[in-house]
Design a protein with these regions (language model features):
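Preference for long, amphipathic alpha-helical scaffolds in soluble/luminal domains
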Residues: 1-297
Length: 297
């Protein structure tokens, strides 16, 4: 996001590099969780972030990361969200990504593809992506990453099922029709839908600038509104961007990172369950104190 919107502060560059280097495994890959296996998509994202931060391609850490990417199948086999980011940064063809026509916001609440058929945590991402996937913004970068692709970028389209199911032909045809409509939408209906999506997003922004207190809908909402032509100094976008600095940015010594979410109630609950499962007494003062704190919230 910082690269795309031109918001990277020069003083933050060393901290971001230090964080990425510190979390790289000895085998060159990055993990989704501690002690887990190297993850292809995470490794591709970290590699390109370091390249974009100014680390040379022949840096030993990037040489080992590149080798891991190729061992895991190459950037052409990354997940949908990684390819989405690469498309936004001009590193992957938008035509190989699925679309979500913003007109879906106009569906009745009980319709199968209505946003209200999704959980609240997914709904914000789903709605914001209606704009991002239809507007297909590109923020060209002066650093490429073609060395991570084992085939031409786009030969393994995002969203392609590993094992086709009985609904695959129907869904593939539906996506083809959606893409065809997205290329030539009905103007008045598209404008109505985009305005409805923008209003939906703005009405659900939290006081701290986030959407749902989690990173995905937050970032995609920023990109959605910006793709609609909203300037970064618009009050909604300014509040959203300021929120990253205020509550989500963590400085740990010489390292800098942005948290995926803030979840003290959730974390307290999970920690209490873990302690109980480990044999802690139900009358334990700490457990009772945490339960009381959760009830107070």
């Amino acid at each position: 996001m910082l690269f795309a919107l031109g918001l990277l502060r020069e003083e933050d560059r060393p901290g971001l590099i230090a964080e990425l280097r510190a979390t790289q495994g000895a085998d060159g890959g990055w993990r989704v969780w501690y002690s887990g296996p190297p993850d292809l998509s995470t490794t591709v994202e970290a590699y390109y972030a370091l390249r974009r931060l100014g680390v040379a391609a022949d840096d030993p850490d990037l040489v080992s990361a590149r080798a891991m990417v190729h061992r895991l199948g190459g950037a052409d086999r990354t997940r949908f969200f990684t390819k989405l980011w690469l498309a936004v940064l001009g590193q992957y063809p938008w035509r190989h990504l699925p679309v979500l026509p913003p007109e879906m916001i106009l569906l009745p609440d009980r319709a199968p593809l209505s946003p209200y058929r999704f959980g609240s945590w997914a709904r914000g991402t789903f709605v914001a992506l209606m704009i991002v996937l239809s507007r297909q913004p590109v923020y060209p970068q002066d650093v490429g990453m073609q060395e991570l692709f084992t085939e031409a970028a786009g030969t393994n389209p995002a969203g392609e099922p590993k094992t086709p199911g009985r609904w695959t032909p129907l869904l593939t045809r539906a996506m083809g029709l959606a893409k065809l409509y997205t290329r030539r939408p009905f103007g008045p209906l598209r404008r109505l839908a985009e305005a409805r999506v923008a209003r939906w997003i703005c009405e659900r922004q939290e006081a701290d600038g986030s959407w749902g207190g989690i990173q995905p809908p937050w970032i995609y909402s920023i990109f959605a509104l910006h793709a609609l032509g909203w300037p970064l100094d618009h009050p909604v976008l300014k509040r959203a961007l300021d929120g990253f600095d205020d509550t989500f940015t963590v400085r740990d010594g010489d390292r800098l990172r942005i948290q995926a979410c803030l979840s003290p109630i959730w974390d307290t609950c999970l920690a209490g369950v873990a302690l109980a499962d480990a044999g802690a007494d139900e009358d334990d003062q700490d457990l009772r104190a945490s339960a009381g704190w959760m009830l107070s919230k």
